[in-house]
């Protein structure tokens, strides 16, 4: 049985279309028995997102809130087919957890498979990126088998996003093909809620668990399935946050 020991993709009301404070999100994660929570508000190119100053100042928050370690991160926006992100490296390198995602407000239109494949291959080379966010989207289908091999080589975690069934249903069907490619490539994945409120935490997790069970996905490749696996993954990313998370 797959379980989630930490959520690596959540938002707070700093992203104005979300609803809860970081303290409230941390408290809810603690009550769910999580070992850690990543708070990853949208990069500044996204409408309703925080100013770039936020991503400097978030590092000054306590490392532990409401009794749970908090990874202070960002969901950076991919801005073009060259894989350019909307936050500079000096900001990204100071964060605990960085997601790279495509949002249509920042990269409108539909990409060809070739364009999307090239885009993600370039993102894979960015050492500041830790995880690839909701990349199953219908408008940006890429060569999953080719790219997940490169993701694995560069220690990129591929997100399986529980919120996609609600907000990106047209692409949710691609999740199985993406997961199968990760299984074949030995590429790590994370099961996340992409919650924008405490009421969405664990959103879609049941769908994700059933999907992994259906394809007999190796539990050891699910990086947030236990504190130990999360700790091991963070060490691969050279994150100082490992000192705040116990690995059992």
Regions found by a protein language model. Name each.
Residues 8, 12-27, 56-57:
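N-terminal pre-domain/capping segments
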Residues 16-20, 48-52, 141-150, 168-183, ...:
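Histidine/acidic-residue-rich catalytic or RNA/ligand-binding cores of hydrolases
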Residues 42, 187-202:
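Short acidic/histidine-rich active-site segments
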Residues 23-37, 60-63:
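Alpha-helical scaffold segments that flank or form the walls of functional sites
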Residues 43, 48-160, 213-222, 230-248:
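Extended substrate/RNA-proximal surfaces in nucleic-acid metabolism proteins
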Residues 5-15, 39-42, 132-136, 193-195:
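Histidine-centered catalytic micro-motifs
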Residues 3-5, 36-37, 71, 130, ...:
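Hydrophobic "anchor" residues on beta-strands that sit immediately upstream
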């Amino acid at each position: 049985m797959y379980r989630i020991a930490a959520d690596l993709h959540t938002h707070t009301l700093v992203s104005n279309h979300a609803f809860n404070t970081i303290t409230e999100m941390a408290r809810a994660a603690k009550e769910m028995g999580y070992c850690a929570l990543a708070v990853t508000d949208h990069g500044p190119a996204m409408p309703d997102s925080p100013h770039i100053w936020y991503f400097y100042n978030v590092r000054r928050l306590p490392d532990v809130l409401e009794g749970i370690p908090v990874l202070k991160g960002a969901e950076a926006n991919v801005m073009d087919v060259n894989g350019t992100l909307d936050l500079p490296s000096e900001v990204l390198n100071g964060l605990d957890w960085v997601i790279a995602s495509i949002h249509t407000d920042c990269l409108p239109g539909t990409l060809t498979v070739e364009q999307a494949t090239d885009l993600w291959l370039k993102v894979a080379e960015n050492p500041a990126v830790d995880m690839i966010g909701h990349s199953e989207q219908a408008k940006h289908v890429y060569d999953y088998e080719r790219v997940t091999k490169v993701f694995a080589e560069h220690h990129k975690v591929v997100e399986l996003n529980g919120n996609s069934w609600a907000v990106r249903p047209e692409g949710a069907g691609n999740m199985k093909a993406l997961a199968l490619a990760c299984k074949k490539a030995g590429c790590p994945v994370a099961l996340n809620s992409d919650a924008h409120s405490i009421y969405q935490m664990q959103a879609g997790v049941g769908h994700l668990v059933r999907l992994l069970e259906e394809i007999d996905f190796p539990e050891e490749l699910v990086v947030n399935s236990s504190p130990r696996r999360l700790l091991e993954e963070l060490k691969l990313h050279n994150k100082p946050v490992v000192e705040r998370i116990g690995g059992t």
